[in-house]
Amino acid sequence: MKIGIFDSGLGGLSVLNEALKKLPNEEFLYYADRKNVPYGLKSKDEILKFSSHAVKFLIDQGANAIVIACNTATSAAINELRAKFDLPIIGMEPAVKKAADLNREGENSASLRTLVIATPLTVQGAKLKELIERVDSEHLVDVLALPRLVEFAENENFACDEVKEYLREEFAKFKLQNYCALVLGCTHFNYFKDSLREILPAGVSLIDGNEGTINKLISELSRLNLAHGKGQSVEYFYSDAKIYDNGELARIGRYLARLNKMLEIK
Protein backbone atom coordinates (compact mmCIF):
# COMPACT_ATOMS: atom_id res chain seq x y z
CA MET A 1 0.00 0.00 0.00
CA LYS A 2 1.54 3.28 -1.15
CA ILE A 3 0.11 6.75 -0.65
CA GLY A 4 1.23 9.49 -3.02
CA ILE A 5 1.33 13.03 -1.64
CA PHE A 6 1.76 15.80 -4.17
CA ASP A 7 2.44 19.53 -3.88
CA SER A 8 3.90 22.27 -6.02
CA GLY A 9 6.85 22.32 -3.63
CA LEU A 10 7.65 21.72 0.03
CA GLY A 11 4.47 23.09 1.59
CA GLY A 12 2.84 19.68 1.34
CA LEU A 13 5.37 18.34 3.82
CA SER A 14 2.97 19.73 6.44
CA VAL A 15 0.34 17.28 5.16
CA LEU A 16 2.87 14.45 4.98
CA ASN A 17 3.86 15.24 8.58
CA GLU A 18 0.25 14.82 9.70
CA ALA A 19 -0.03 11.58 7.71
CA LEU A 20 3.13 10.16 9.27
CA LYS A 21 1.66 10.68 12.73
CA LYS A 22 -1.71 9.10 11.93
CA LEU A 23 -0.69 6.30 9.54
CA PRO A 24 2.37 4.65 11.11
CA ASN A 25 2.30 1.54 8.92
CA GLU A 26 1.97 2.94 5.39
CA GLU A 27 4.46 3.69 2.62
CA PHE A 28 4.51 7.26 1.30
CA LEU A 29 5.68 8.83 -1.95
CA TYR A 30 6.18 12.60 -1.66
CA TYR A 31 6.26 14.53 -4.95
CA ALA A 32 7.35 18.18 -4.88
CA ASP A 33 7.01 19.77 -8.32
CA ARG A 34 9.91 22.12 -7.68
CA LYS A 35 10.52 22.50 -11.40
CA ASN A 36 7.23 24.42 -11.69
CA VAL A 37 6.75 25.99 -8.24
CA PRO A 38 4.92 28.25 -7.46
CA TYR A 39 1.50 27.27 -8.80
CA GLY A 40 -0.40 30.21 -7.30
CA LEU A 41 0.45 32.63 -10.13
CA LYS A 42 0.02 30.16 -13.01
CA SER A 43 -3.04 29.54 -15.18
CA LYS A 44 -5.63 26.86 -14.43
CA ASP A 45 -4.66 24.98 -17.60
CA GLU A 46 -0.98 24.95 -16.59
CA ILE A 47 -1.81 23.65 -13.12
CA LEU A 48 -4.04 20.93 -14.56
CA LYS A 49 -1.20 19.85 -16.85
CA PHE A 50 1.36 19.78 -14.01
CA SER A 51 -1.05 18.03 -11.64
CA SER A 52 -2.00 15.36 -14.17
CA HIS A 53 1.66 14.63 -14.79
CA ALA A 54 2.36 14.38 -11.06
CA VAL A 55 -0.54 12.02 -10.39
CA LYS A 56 0.40 9.78 -13.33
CA PHE A 57 4.01 9.70 -12.10
CA LEU A 58 2.92 8.67 -8.61
CA ILE A 59 0.65 5.96 -10.00
CA ASP A 60 3.59 4.67 -12.05
CA GLN A 61 5.57 4.49 -8.79
CA GLY A 62 2.87 2.29 -7.28
CA ALA A 63 0.56 4.76 -5.51
CA ASN A 64 -2.82 3.30 -4.51
CA ALA A 65 -4.22 6.64 -3.31
CA ILE A 66 -3.29 10.28 -3.88
CA VAL A 67 -3.41 13.32 -1.60
CA ILE A 68 -3.19 16.66 -3.39
CA ALA A 69 -1.42 18.52 -0.59
CA CYS A 70 -1.82 21.82 -2.43
CA ASN A 71 -4.84 24.09 -2.10
CA THR A 72 -4.11 25.71 -5.46
CA ALA A 73 -3.95 22.41 -7.36
CA THR A 74 -7.08 21.20 -5.55
CA SER A 75 -8.94 24.35 -6.55
CA ALA A 76 -7.80 24.22 -10.17
CA ALA A 77 -7.69 20.54 -11.00
CA ILE A 78 -9.24 18.04 -8.58
CA ASN A 79 -12.49 17.46 -10.48
CA GLU A 80 -10.62 16.73 -13.71
CA LEU A 81 -8.10 14.51 -11.91
CA ARG A 82 -10.83 12.43 -10.30
CA ALA A 83 -12.51 11.99 -13.67
CA LYS A 84 -9.24 10.97 -15.33
CA PHE A 85 -7.69 8.59 -12.78
CA ASP A 86 -9.30 5.54 -11.19
CA LEU A 87 -8.06 5.72 -7.60
CA PRO A 88 -8.93 7.71 -4.46
CA ILE A 89 -7.82 11.35 -4.77
CA ILE A 90 -8.11 13.49 -1.62
CA GLY A 91 -7.78 17.26 -1.92
CA MET A 92 -7.17 20.17 0.41
CA GLU A 93 -9.94 22.45 1.60
CA PRO A 94 -9.35 25.63 3.63
CA ALA A 95 -10.77 25.00 7.11
CA VAL A 96 -13.38 27.74 6.79
CA LYS A 97 -16.15 25.62 8.33
CA LYS A 98 -13.95 24.77 11.32
CA ALA A 99 -13.24 28.48 11.81
CA ALA A 100 -16.93 29.36 11.47
CA ASP A 101 -17.86 26.71 14.05
CA LEU A 102 -15.27 28.08 16.48
CA ASN A 103 -16.60 31.58 15.91
CA ARG A 104 -20.17 30.51 16.73
CA GLU A 105 -18.96 28.98 19.98
CA GLY A 106 -17.27 32.23 21.06
CA GLU A 107 -18.78 34.86 23.30
CA ASN A 108 -18.66 37.58 20.61
CA SER A 109 -19.59 35.40 17.65
CA ALA A 110 -21.98 37.94 16.18
CA SER A 111 -19.24 40.48 15.50
CA LEU A 112 -15.99 38.57 14.96
CA ARG A 113 -14.66 37.76 11.50
CA THR A 114 -12.49 35.10 9.84
CA LEU A 115 -9.63 35.82 7.44
CA VAL A 116 -8.56 33.20 4.88
CA ILE A 117 -5.03 33.59 3.49
CA ALA A 118 -4.08 31.68 0.34
CA THR A 119 -2.46 31.99 -3.10
CA PRO A 120 -3.99 34.31 -5.74
CA LEU A 121 -5.46 31.42 -7.74
CA THR A 122 -7.13 29.90 -4.68
CA VAL A 123 -8.49 33.29 -3.59
CA GLN A 124 -9.89 33.96 -7.06
CA GLY A 125 -11.13 30.41 -7.67
CA ALA A 126 -14.72 29.24 -7.67
CA LYS A 127 -14.03 26.44 -5.19
CA LEU A 128 -13.18 28.78 -2.30
CA LYS A 129 -16.03 31.14 -3.17
CA GLU A 130 -18.49 28.22 -3.12
CA LEU A 131 -17.11 26.99 0.21
CA ILE A 132 -17.43 30.42 1.80
CA GLU A 133 -20.98 30.86 0.48
CA ARG A 134 -21.90 27.47 1.93
CA VAL A 135 -20.68 28.12 5.48
CA ASP A 136 -20.69 31.93 5.79
CA SER A 137 -24.34 32.95 5.76
CA GLU A 138 -23.52 36.00 7.89
CA HIS A 139 -20.77 37.27 5.52
CA LEU A 140 -18.04 37.26 8.16
CA VAL A 141 -15.25 35.75 6.03
CA ASP A 142 -12.61 37.79 4.21
CA VAL A 143 -9.81 36.58 1.93
CA LEU A 144 -6.23 37.72 1.33
CA ALA A 145 -3.70 36.50 -1.22
CA LEU A 146 -0.13 36.16 0.12
CA PRO A 147 1.90 34.83 -2.85
CA ARG A 148 5.30 35.79 -1.49
CA LEU A 149 5.00 33.38 1.45
CA VAL A 150 5.38 30.46 -0.98
CA GLU A 151 8.62 31.94 -2.29
CA PHE A 152 9.89 32.54 1.25
CA ALA A 153 9.08 28.95 2.23
CA GLU A 154 10.76 27.39 -0.80
CA ASN A 155 13.90 29.40 -0.04
CA GLU A 156 13.86 28.36 3.63
CA ASN A 157 13.28 31.95 4.78
CA PHE A 158 10.87 31.56 7.66
CA ALA A 159 11.12 33.96 10.60
CA CYS A 160 13.26 36.66 8.98
CA ASP A 161 12.52 40.40 9.16
CA GLU A 162 11.49 40.48 5.49
CA VAL A 163 8.73 37.94 6.14
CA LYS A 164 7.43 39.86 9.15
CA GLU A 165 7.50 43.17 7.28
CA TYR A 166 5.56 41.61 4.40
CA LEU A 167 2.94 40.19 6.75
CA ARG A 168 2.56 43.47 8.64
CA GLU A 169 2.07 45.39 5.38
CA GLU A 170 -0.57 42.96 4.13
CA PHE A 171 -2.43 42.66 7.43
CA ALA A 172 -2.53 46.45 7.77
CA LYS A 173 -5.48 46.30 5.34
CA PHE A 174 -7.59 44.71 8.09
CA LYS A 175 -8.67 45.61 11.62
CA LEU A 176 -7.29 42.45 13.15
CA GLN A 177 -8.92 43.08 16.52
CA ASN A 178 -12.22 42.27 14.79
CA TYR A 179 -11.10 38.73 13.86
CA CYS A 180 -11.24 35.45 15.75
CA ALA A 181 -9.53 33.12 13.25
CA LEU A 182 -6.91 33.08 10.52
CA VAL A 183 -7.35 30.15 8.11
CA LEU A 184 -4.15 28.96 6.43
CA GLY A 185 -5.39 28.23 2.91
CA CYS A 186 -2.02 27.15 1.55
CA THR A 187 0.10 24.32 2.93
CA HIS A 188 3.24 26.47 2.63
CA PHE A 189 1.84 28.86 5.23
CA ASN A 190 2.23 26.40 8.12
CA TYR A 191 5.95 27.25 8.23
CA PHE A 192 5.14 30.80 9.35
CA LYS A 193 3.00 30.18 12.42
CA ASP A 194 5.56 31.78 14.73
CA SER A 195 5.69 35.00 12.71
CA LEU A 196 1.90 35.02 12.33
CA ARG A 197 1.44 34.48 16.07
CA GLU A 198 3.84 37.35 16.80
CA ILE A 199 1.90 39.76 14.57
CA LEU A 200 -1.72 38.73 15.19
CA PRO A 201 -3.73 39.62 18.31
CA ALA A 202 -3.72 36.88 20.94
CA GLY A 203 -7.40 36.13 20.38
CA VAL A 204 -6.95 35.15 16.73
CA SER A 205 -6.67 31.37 16.30
CA LEU A 206 -4.51 29.82 13.56
CA ILE A 207 -6.39 27.08 11.70
CA ASP A 208 -5.26 24.80 8.87
CA GLY A 209 -6.89 21.94 6.97
CA ASN A 210 -4.18 19.29 7.33
CA GLU A 211 -5.84 17.19 10.02
CA GLY A 212 -9.16 17.21 8.19
CA THR A 213 -7.49 16.14 4.95
CA ILE A 214 -5.70 13.18 6.53
CA ASN A 215 -8.86 12.17 8.39
CA LYS A 216 -10.63 12.05 5.02
CA LEU A 217 -7.79 9.94 3.64
CA ILE A 218 -8.02 7.50 6.55
CA SER A 219 -11.78 7.24 6.13
CA GLU A 220 -11.44 6.54 2.41
CA LEU A 221 -8.71 3.94 2.91
CA SER A 222 -10.85 2.21 5.51
CA ARG A 223 -13.92 2.28 3.27
CA LEU A 224 -11.97 0.68 0.43
CA ASN A 225 -10.07 -1.68 2.74
CA LEU A 226 -6.75 -0.29 1.49
CA ALA A 227 -4.98 0.52 4.77
CA HIS A 228 -2.93 -2.59 5.46
CA GLY A 229 0.71 -1.53 5.44
CA LYS A 230 3.42 -3.38 7.32
CA GLY A 231 5.85 -0.55 8.01
CA GLN A 232 6.29 3.17 7.46
CA SER A 233 8.63 4.58 4.81
CA VAL A 234 8.92 7.71 2.66
CA GLU A 235 10.43 8.24 -0.78
CA TYR A 236 10.94 11.83 -1.94
CA PHE A 237 10.82 13.16 -5.51
CA TYR A 238 11.54 16.61 -6.92
CA SER A 239 9.35 16.59 -10.02
CA ASP A 240 10.33 13.30 -11.72
CA ALA A 241 13.67 12.76 -9.94
CA LYS A 242 13.99 10.65 -6.81
CA ILE A 243 16.00 12.37 -4.08
CA TYR A 244 19.13 10.51 -3.05
CA ASP A 245 21.34 13.51 -2.26
CA ASN A 246 22.09 13.67 1.47
CA GLY A 247 22.08 17.45 1.41
CA GLU A 248 18.55 17.60 0.02
CA LEU A 249 17.33 14.90 2.38
CA ALA A 250 18.81 16.88 5.27
CA ARG A 251 16.99 19.96 3.98
CA ILE A 252 13.69 18.08 3.97
CA GLY A 253 14.51 16.97 7.52
CA ARG A 254 14.91 20.62 8.56
CA TYR A 255 11.52 21.46 7.06
CA LEU A 256 9.85 18.60 8.92
CA ALA A 257 11.56 19.63 12.17
CA ARG A 258 10.26 23.16 11.74
CA LEU A 259 6.75 21.88 11.08
CA ASN A 260 6.85 19.89 14.32
CA LYS A 261 7.87 23.05 16.13
CA MET A 262 5.02 24.98 14.47
CA LEU A 263 2.49 22.37 15.66
CA GLU A 264 2.91 23.80 19.15
CA ILE A 265 1.63 27.20 18.00
CA LYS A 266 -2.13 27.71 17.87
Swiss-Prot record:
InterPro entries: Asp/Glu/hydantoin_racemase, Asp/Glu_race, Asp/Glu_racemase_AS_1, Glu_race. The keyword Cell wall biogenesis/degradation applies. The keyword Signal does not apply. Its EC number is 5.1.1.3. It is an enzyme of class 5 (isomerase). One of its GO terms (biological process) is cell wall organization. Pathway: Cell wall biogenesis; peptidoglycan biosynthesis. GO terms for molecular function: glutamate racemase activity. Pfam families: Asp_Glu_race (PF01177). Substrate binds at D7, S8, Y39, G40, N71, T72, T187, H188. Keywords: Cell shape, Cell wall biogenesis/degradation, Isomerase, Peptidoglycan synthesis. The active site is at C70 (proton donor/acceptor), C186 (proton donor/acceptor). It catalyses: L-glutamate = D-glutamate. Belongs to the aspartate/glutamate racemases family. HAMAP family: Glu_racemase. NCBIfam families: glut_race (TIGR00067). Provides the (R)-glutamate required for cell wall biosynthesis. This is Glutamate racemase. It comes from Campylobacter curvus (strain 525.92). The gene is murI.
